[in-house]
């Protein structure tokens, strides 16, 4: 073992605050997504529905409406405005954000597209965790859980992390298929156990 959570083994002293012991606070600082004048999607988000540090946001979209383009614009905006400390950037920001793209049940082409976008935008500093649509449901849920745990470890180290998850619906379906049934069914065919 050479590194633990990205740190050399020698520097790991075992002293860290557990994620569960951290305080949750209301967002008080905005994440600016706007970059250039020709990219309007992130500017509209900043004006109409700003996203703050510590906030959760949801993009609801019908198929073929441009959700993937919006996700890529959000990733690019965060990478430009809040580059990681070791990443070279022209923007001098007090904060840096580590980007994690988590893709559940995606087509392989979409995974490649997002992977390239994250690498290009972050200088290969961001992470992509993905499961393809043809993988078993248990593997799809495992990818999401591992990514969440990785993000928690980074937050415990004092980093700001943004998880871009595509898609919550496919994640819920994977849990619905992977978990044993309770015998009850909610609207949409979901088992209540899959939602908790």
Regions found by a protein language model. Give the residues of each.
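Interdomain "pre-motor" coupling segment immediately N-terminal to P-loop NTPase/helicase cores
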Residues: 1-18
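Short loop/turn motifs enriched for small/polar and acidic residues
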Residues: 4, 104, 168
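Residue-level marker of positions within ordered structural domains that often coincide
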Residues: 6, 59, 152
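Short beta-strands and strand-coil junctions in structured, solvent-facing domains, enriched
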Residues: 7-10, 65, 170
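Active-site phosphate-binding and catalytic loops of NTP-dependent enzymes
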Residues: 9-14, 31-33, 40, 156
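Phosphate-binding glycine-rich loops and their immediate beta-loop-alpha structural context
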Residues: 21-86, 92-144
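Conserved P-loop NTPase nucleotide-binding/switch module
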Residues: 111, 118-123, 127-129, 137-196
């Amino acid at each position: 073992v050479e590194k633990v959570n990205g740190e050399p083994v020698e520097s790991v002293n075992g002293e860290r605050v557990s994620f569960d012991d951290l305080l949750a606070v209301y967002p008080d600082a905005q994440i600016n997504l706007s970059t250039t004048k020709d990219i309007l999607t992130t500017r509209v988000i900043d004006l109409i529905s700003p996203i703050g540090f510590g906030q959760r946001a949801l993009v609801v979209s019908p198929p073929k409406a441009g959700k993937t383009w919006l996700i890529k614009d959000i990733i690019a905006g965060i990478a430009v405005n809040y580059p990681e400390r070791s990443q070279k950037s022209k923007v001098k920001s007090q904060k840096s954000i580590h980007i994690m793209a988590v893709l559940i049940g995606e087509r392989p082409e979409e995974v490649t597209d997002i992977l390239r976008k994250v690498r290009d935008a972050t200088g290969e500093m961001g992470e992509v965790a993905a499961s393809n649509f043809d993988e078993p449901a248990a593997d799809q849920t495992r990818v999401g859980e591992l990514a969440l745990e990785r993000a928690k470890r980074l937050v415990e180290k004092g980093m700001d992390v943004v998880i871009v998850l595509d898609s919550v619906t496919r994640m819920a379906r994977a849990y619905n298929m992977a978990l044993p049934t309770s015998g009850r069914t909610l609207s949409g065919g979901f088992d209540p156990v899959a939602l908790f």
